[in-house]
């Protein structure tokens, strides 16, 4: 029997890069779906945060709602817009699974992902500052902590930050993955 030698040429290397890019594209799709769920959960959790104190009177109503604070409104809007963007970018991510060598659409996703990351970061940072003040107050300005009275509201608003900051980390990974796939093209 003769020994047959097989050379690894350009054809086998191209298939390997194509397979790696397809794997990156599948991971990109999964990360987009998880980030979408995180931003949706954050927007819903903050948007439904509401608590009234039990000793409210007919004249004075002690109630905490997300829409009383502009930073929380911005948080809900930024998470909602990012969630819609992620939903609209899923078909492009599926397209990248089918055609893993697509370049222009990857560049578009990198730019749009970066814009949405900045938007999401600004909303989450504004809300995080208010949640910090709600928990700790600021003694030099005589702002007192309200979380001893509004425990449910504070827990819900702080919990909504977790999904948003998680989605921010996933958006950073999405940008890195798209850049890697683009460089391997």
UniProtKB/Swiss-Prot annotation:
The chain crosses the membrane at residues 26-46, 74-94, 107-127, 161-181. Residues 1-25, 95-106, 182-185 are cytoplasmic. GO terms for cellular component: plasma membrane. Residues 47-73, 128-160 are extracellular. One of its GO terms (biological process) is cell wall organization. The keyword Ion transport does not apply. This is Casparian strip membrane protein 2.
